[in-house]
Regions:
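Active-site loop segments of alpha/beta catalytic cores
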Residues: 1-42, 82, 88-94, 106-352
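Catalytic domains of carbohydrate-active enzymes, especially glycoside hydrolases
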Residues: 45-65, 184-188
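A basic- and aromatic-enriched beta-loop-alpha substructure that forms the phosphate/nucleotide-
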Residues: 75
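ATPase catalytic-site recognition across NTP-hydrolyzing enzymes
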Residues: 100
Length: 352
């Protein structure tokens, strides 16, 4: 079974030859340390991202397209960039802060124009689709993450409560761009789409239910329908945090998979598999707060085995950390995770 077939089979809730494995992102520092290389410390790099996944025996890659434009340096030497959405931010390469938000006031929401989709080229998706047998996810943004990054998180949340109509309008405009982005990524060869949209704290959703039903869920439904009108592919949601109170809504929106399942936020994968495993393919749940970053390789092995036991039966599970292989993950722990997945994740070996 090829990597692409393995992931597609799991997403269809059937058992492949082995539990598929992969990461939504692998940070540059981790990749360079594992490979002994000095690839650029940037978010995405084809050769680095290919080599590190090959080294770990990973089955999928997740690539987006996030254009930004260099505006020069500020008085402190920080680089100033303009995103595709129109906000401007200062960046050190590993962090950023807004210097000019998407709109100065909510009164500008009506005059704000949806970004030009011609900015999206899909080059990395096209490269992976052409040269590798890995399953290729194309990632786009969701209404919450885009606006909290372009306005500031606190400013976004206040506006969602006090200027709900304007936030709804801005969300519609940025999601029009994201829908067009998804179409470009699919035409470039993406096999499925992931909507990256962090909507919850570790304690529960960012926004109250009545606001979610105004500025989040209807837009998810529209976005999924728009993507599927272009091509009938699986559409999944990535969100960190505690989603248990809104899992019914996630399913009702039309998502067919969920990534993160953050255990430190109380996401119990056995319970989620029991309640939602027929509707959602599950990706993630390997802890980053302690297990991958501070535990021993032997502890990592035991957690991987118990997670596979809880979630892999009947298909519908893909082994992954609950976010990304970040720089603070020791190489030995990543190798332990993926080696265990290769050995213990064989369906005919375990009898699942």
């Amino acid at each position: 079974m090829t990597k692409k077939e393995r992931v597609a089979t799991a997403l269809a809730h059937r058992e492949p030859d082995r539990v598929p494995m992969g990461e939504m992102s692998i940070e540059a520092g981790f990749a360079n340390r594992l490979l002994g290389t000095s690839f650029p410390v940037v978010y995405q790099n084809y050769e680095r991202d290919r080599q590190v996944r090959e080294s770990l025996g990973i089955d999928y890659v997740n690539m987006g397209d996030w254009p930004s434009y260099d505006l020069g340096l500020d008085q402190h030497g920080y680089r100033i960039c303009r995103s595709a959405y129109g906000d401007e931010y200062a960046t050190t390469g590993s962090s950023r802060h807004i210097v000019k938000p998407l709109v100065a006031t909510m009164d500008e929401a009506r005059s704000y124009r949806s970004p030009d989709p011609r900015q999206i080229k899909g080059e990395l998706v096209r490269a992976f689709a052409a040269d590798e047998d890995m399953f290729v996810f194309g990632q786009i943004g969701g209404p919450v993450t885009i606006l909290d990054e372009c306005l500031g998180m606190e400013e976004y949340m206040i506006a969602a409560l006090e200027s709900t109509d304007e936030i709804q309008l801005l969300s519609e405009k940025v999601l029009t761009f994201e829908a067009e982005k998804a179409k470009v990524l699919l035409d470039a060869g993406a096999d499925a789409i992931i909507v990256g949209d962090d909507i919850a704290f570790n304690s529960g959703p960012f926004l109250p239910p009545k606001i979610m039903h105004r500025v989040v869920y209807p837009l998810y439904k529209w976005l999924i329908a728009e993507i599927k009108r272009h091509k009938d592919v699986k559409v999944l949601l990535h969100s960190d945090g505690q989603l248990t109170p809104i899992m019914d809504e996630v399913v009702a929106c039309g998502f067919e998979g969920l990534h993160s399942l953050q255990p430190s936020a109380g996401m119990d994968i056995a319970e989620i598999k029991h309640r939602y495993g027929d509707a959602l393919a599950l990706i993630g749940n390997i802890d980053l707060d302690y297990v991958m970053t501070r535990a021993s390789p032997a502890e990592v092995e035991q957690v991987v085995k118990s997670t596979i036991d809880a979630a892999a039966h009947g298909g519908g599970y893909i082994l992954s950390t609950c976010n990304a292989l970040v720089d603070s993950v020791p190489s030995a722990n990543a190798l332990a995770m993926y080696d265990t997945g290769h050995r213990y994740g064989m369906y005919h070996h375990t009898g699942r």
